Every structure is written in structure tokens, then in C-alpha cells.
């Protein structure tokens, strides 16, 4: 993974030398806020300047590159916002770099714009899918960790001691696999949900709140990907459950398995 991380850093830096970056954070819940926060941290750490995307602004198809925030928004049949945004704006930019994502469907978008896209996948199922659309590894499709792993974790910590036993943080939305009610549940990812994350201060404060909540617990039970990632980064015991499609297990297999031994994936019975 170190080599892939290096390629991720270097590729963005190589484009940055001769192009202006225009960043559009992925809309969504507080997990998408974590992705945005980590992206801002990544930009700062690598001295990558950018401007936020704004409706009505004029962009150059010669010099501007759209950086589309990663995540799980490009899932045909579940979410359309990311697809529609890219479809409506791709002609304004020299390239569109899709930050680490899980992608399902929307084949026409990717086939018809193969010369415009550089796609970073965050797990192998998406990587294999994008390759099947004639994208070439190390040219216009890459694989790396979810952006949350690029978070500058220390600046979000409260360092409060652990004094609570376990937190249940299960989905209460359409990505829940079972829809079952969980006792004493805290779906903290839904504290915010919308197109908010171009505001880096809001993104970071939301992320800080999620981390500060999780810091107090010894065990975290969740089917929320970014709750599982944050809890793993914090060294918690994590029981990680499937969502309604392959995303959770695929990211677990690529980025969490064998790296965070206190995180276990609980397969559906």
C-alpha cells in the first residue's frame, strides 16, 4: 500500500505543477465530512493549493482540473447526485480526478469520458470494475486507501479517557442491510447530511465531534464505514458489519484486514 500511496501523492503533485485544482467535496452524511476533512489535511500536507467549486464560476478546460471528493456516492440505483454533478460539469475541465471511491454502475459515464477521468478506487471490486471498462492501471485507474486514512488524526483528538463499554452506531437509512432496530443506537453519521463539506471548518468540526464521541468507548459496533475506520484509527475494538452492498467488506479487506487486528468483520448469517 505504501507504493500506491506514493503514486497517489506523486500523481496529484504532477498535475498540480501545471494545472489549477478545483475541489468539489462529495455531498452526504458526516462520513463524507470525514472524507472532506482528510482531503483538506492531505492537500495541506502536500502543499496542494485548490479553489472550492462554485456554481456560476467560469472554469478553463485547458488549465483547470476538477477534484471530485471520493466516497460511495457513485452507486447507481442508490445515489445520483455525484453522477449528475460530474455529467453536468465534466466539459468545463481539462480532467476530472475522482478521489478514492467505491463505484457501482454508471458505465456510460465512465466509458464515454475515459479520456477525461483519472479514477482512484478504494477497494479491489471497484478497481476490477473500472478496469473492465478499458481503464488502464497506473494510467487512468489506481487503487489506494479511503481518504479517511489520510486524516491528520492528532489534531482532532480530545484525549478523553475511555470509560464507556460499547457504542452501537448502526445505519438507519437505505444502506442498512437488515433495517433492524438496535437498542441504544447512535447513528452519529446522520448528525449532518447534505451538501455541506466544501466548508472545511464545518467538515473538520463535524469530524472532530465524531472522533470525540468514539474516544470514550472501548468497543464500537457499527455498519457505518467511516465510524469503523475512525474507531480503528483510535485503536478501539471494532465489530464491523455489512451494509446493503459490498462496500464495507471490500474496504475492510483492502485497508483494515491484518492492519487493525482489533477490528473484525462480522459476516451476515
Question: Where in the sequence are the language-model features?
Answer:
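Active-site anion-handling motifs in enzyme catalytic cores
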Residues: 1-269
Amino acid at each position: 500500500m505504501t507504493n500506491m500511496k506514493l503514486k497517489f501523492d506523486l500523481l496529484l503533485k504532477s498535475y498540480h505543477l501545471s494545472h489549477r485544482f478545483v475541489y468539489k467535496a462529495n455531498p452526504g452524511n458526516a462520513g463524507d465530512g470525514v472524507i472532506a476533512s482528510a482531503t483538506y489535511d492531505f492537500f495541506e500536507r502536500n502543499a496542494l493549493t485548490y479553489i472550492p467549486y462554485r456554481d456560476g464560476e467560469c472554469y478553463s478546460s485547458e488549465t483547470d482540473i476538477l477534484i471530485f471528493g471520493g466516497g460511495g456516492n457513485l452507486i447507481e440505483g442508490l445515489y445520483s447526485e455525484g453522477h449528475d454533478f460530474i455529467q453536468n460539469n465534466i466539459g468545463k475541465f481539462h480532467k476530472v480526478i475522482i478521489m478514492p471511491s467505491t463505484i457501482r454502475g454508471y458505465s456510460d459515464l465512465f466509458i464515454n469520458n475515459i479520456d477525461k477521468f483519472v479514477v482512484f478506487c478504494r477497494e479491489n471490486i471497484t478497481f476490477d470494475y473500472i478496469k473492465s471498462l478499458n481503464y488502464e492501471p497506473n494510467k487512468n485507474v489506481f487503487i489506494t486507501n479511503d481518504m479517511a486514512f489520510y486524516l491528520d488524526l492528532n489534531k482532532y483528538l480530545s484525549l478523553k479517557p475511555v470509560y464507556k463499554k460499547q457504542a452501537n452506531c448502526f445505519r438507519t437509512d437505505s444502506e442498512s442491510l437488515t433495517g433492524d432496530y438496535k437498542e441504544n443506537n447512535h447513528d452519529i453519521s446522520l448528525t449532518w447530511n447534505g451538501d455541506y463539506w466544501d466548508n472545511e471548518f464545518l467538515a473538520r468540526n463535524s469530524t472532530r465531534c465524531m472522533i470525540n464521541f468514539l474516544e470514550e468507548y472501548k468497543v464500537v459496533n457499527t455498519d457505518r464505514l467511516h465510524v469503523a475506520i475512525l474507531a480503528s484509527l483510535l485503536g478501539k475494538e471494532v465489530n464491523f458489519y455489512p451494509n446493503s452492498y459490498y462496500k464495507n467488506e471490500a474496504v475492510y479487506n483492502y485497508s483494515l484486514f491484518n492492519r487493525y487486528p482489533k477490528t473484525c468483520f462480522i459476516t451476515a448469517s
